[in-house]
Amino acid sequence: MSYNIVLMTAPNKEEAVKIVRTMLEERLIACANIMDPVSSFFWWQGKIGEEKEVLVIMKSHETLFKKLSKRVIELHSYDTPEILALPIVNGSPSYLDWMKACLEPVK
């Protein structure tokens, strides 16, 4: 079983919570952490930008990433939301078993 940590930023905590709750209700993530605020620096429309944002760290299964990503894009207010998946290389067996039980059935 291959699990991912999915990183996403949002403009504010309210939007982050809305997206996280939807992901949980649809069983696309097992859990999430919201870090508020973070300072983000980026290129946008030819200029360097800086914003206070909210960082969301979600735990999921790699086979759910396409659904998760599509759903985040539907719910997110940004034109180009950050949605990045990093593989979980290892974890405690009991935690990974708990994650498996929380997620929609994966193949």
Predicted regions: what they are:
Residues M1-K107:
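Positively charged, small/polar-rich N-terminal and surface patches that mediate targeting and assembly
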